[in-house]
Amino acid sequence: AKWTIPATFQFQNGIEIIVMNNAKIEASGTMTFIRNSMLTIMEKGEVNAEDISFTNGAPAALRNWGALTVANTMTLHSGATLYNKGTITSKNISINSNTKIVNDNKISLEGELNLPSNFSLENNGEIYGEKLIANSDAVATNNNIMKFTTISLTNTTVNNACSMEA
């Protein structure tokens, strides 16, 4: 099945969108998930969007076992969580404080990953990008591969058990 969203679309409080195996969402505008709404992409599910924004906070904003491609920016607002066991490709990921990313497969960025204060990153897969910027009170744990052209860390706790390159 394929769902084409022609413009900016907001998923209101309490909505969970589940993209099943071999299903696809094509969004030409911004997909916004508000409050406790969620996006779950199952294995072999696919979402393509211009922009995607999670304003909901807890519980998990995005759970991905499939493929998520964002042409511009994926935004995680305060309290949002991203669990990735699939593939995420985006120009940038914009993150507010008090958010969390757990990556168990692959995240590829054309631009930057900016880790604000009170942010937690657990990488058990692969993360590639142009620039990694981390600020005070951010915690990054790398158990596999992180490769960026530039890495800038300011008062950041980094637990590196594998390969972190700039």
Predicted regions span which residues?
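Extracellular beta-strand-rich, repetitive "passenger/adhesive" scaffolds
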Residues: 1-166
